[in-house]
C-alpha cells in the first residue's frame, strides 16, 4: 500500500513538473464550411489556445530556440485557398502564428477569380488531370503567390517545403485489387496516366520513401485486356481472381523494373530542389524544413535531404515534442474532425512532456 502510494505521488509530481514543458504541434489541411474543420470550429480551437495562455510559434522559431514555456505549433499541409480566406483572418484576429507546408506545383502567381471551394480530393484530381494533359497543374483551389506573400509579410505565417508534386510511387508488383475509375484519386491518375476500370492495384507510398517500382504504362491496358477476356464474369472467388492476375503479372516481368539508387536520389533531389527554389524565389525566405507527404518517412531520404540543407523533418506521428526536439521527427496531432472537447483534451495531454510521450507511444 505504501509503495503504491509512493509511486502515485512520484507520477503526480512528474506530471506537475513536466507540465507546459512540451511543444505540441497540430496538423490541419482544409478549413472551410464543407470540411470537417469549419472556420467556426477552428476559431474555437484558437479560443482554447488563448484560454490556456499558450504561445503560438512557427517551425523556424522552434528550431531557433525562440520557444517560450507553454508553446504550440499550428501547421497546415498543402496550401489550399481556404487557408488564406478563412485561416489567415482568424490568425490575425487572435494574433497567432502558424506554419504552412507548400506543394508548389499547384500554386498560381495571381488570382483572377475566387473559386467555389471544393474538397481536397476533388481539387487534386482536377489539378492532376490538367498536369497529365498539359504539364501544368496550377489551380485556383490553392493559394496564389500573391496571397502567400501577403501572409508571409504579416510575420504570422512561416512557409516551408512539402514536396513539389506530392505524388506517390509503386513499391511492389503484388496485386491488391483492381481500379474503379469512379474512386481513383490524383495519385492513381499520376501513376496510371488515365482513369480506367480494371487496372491492377499495386502497393504504393509517397515518392520520398525510397526507390520506386517502375511499371511501363502500356502494361496497364495489356492487363486490363487479359482480365476482361479471361477473368471478368468467369471467376467469382476474390482469392482466385488475385491468384490468376498475379500469375499474369509474374509472366510479364519485362514491363517492370526498380529504380537504381542513383535514379532515386536524382528524382528526390530534383523534386525537392524545385519545391525549395520556388518558395524562396517568391518569398525570399530560407526553406530548411520538410514535411513528409502523407507522413510517409524514410531514413535514406532524410540523409539525401540533409545534404540539400534540410534541418528538420515534420511527420504525422502522434505525440508531442520536447523543447530540445528530435528534428529527424517532429510529431504532430492530426485534426480532421476534432470537436472542441477533443481538441482541449489533446492539447492538455500534449503540452505535458510525460503525458505527451505516453500518448505517442500508445497511438
Q: Would you name each region that the model predicts?
A:
Residues 95-122:
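A short, conserved beta-to-alpha structural element at the edge of catalytic cores
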Residues 1-75, 81-82, 86, 171-363:
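C-terminal active-site subregion of NodB/CE4 polysaccharide deacetylases
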Residues 32, 104-106, 163-167, 296:
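Active-site-proximal loop/turn and secondary-structure-junction residues that shape catalytic pockets
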